[in-house]
């Protein structure tokens, strides 16, 4: 799309979103890795993002179940790389209740906390032990 002048190639209707807190990720990765960008901070490279300050969503997207689900929507490329397109990430269902306990964890949890977070998320999605074992033991 083109802006108001030949020098303004884009009149960005969502410009204010760049100033808001957001979750961002690299498009091409070996596994889904999402990062939190605080209000007023900017992303230095082209990458998709979701405008939210909800840390629970960050933890859900970084979970094993989210990676499993999102990878099921696309194709893995050479070397095991997967393109985490926004249209795939947008399709992942986020529970509307039970997120409070996830917000208590830090933005960068320890390995032990990551395991606790995954356990909470498995409960949020009502996974059986068999489903949990499958996700935990699958090859990425």
What does each model-identified segment do?
Residues 1-100, 123:
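Polybasic, glycine- and aromatic-enriched phosphate-binding surface used to engage nucleic acids
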Residues 94-140:
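Non-catalytic DNA-recognition/assembly elements of restriction-modification systems
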């Amino acid at each position: 799309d083109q802006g108001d002048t030949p020098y303004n190639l884009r009149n960005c209707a969502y410009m204010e979103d760049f100033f808001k807190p957001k979750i961002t990720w690299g498009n091409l990765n070996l596994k889904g890795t999402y990062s939190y960008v605080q209000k007023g901070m900017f992303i230095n490279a082209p990458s998709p993002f979701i405008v939210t300050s909800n840390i629970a969503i960050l933890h859900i997207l970084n979970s094993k179940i989210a990676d499993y689900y999102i990878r099921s929507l696309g194709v893995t490329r050479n070397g095991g790389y997967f393109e985490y397109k926004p249209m795939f990430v947008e399709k992942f269902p986020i529970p509307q209740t039970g997120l409070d306990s996830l917000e208590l964890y830090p933005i960068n949890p320890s390995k032990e906390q990551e395991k606790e977070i995954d356990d909470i998320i498995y409960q949020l999605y009502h996974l059986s032990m068999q489903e949990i074992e499958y996700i935990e033991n699958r090859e990425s």
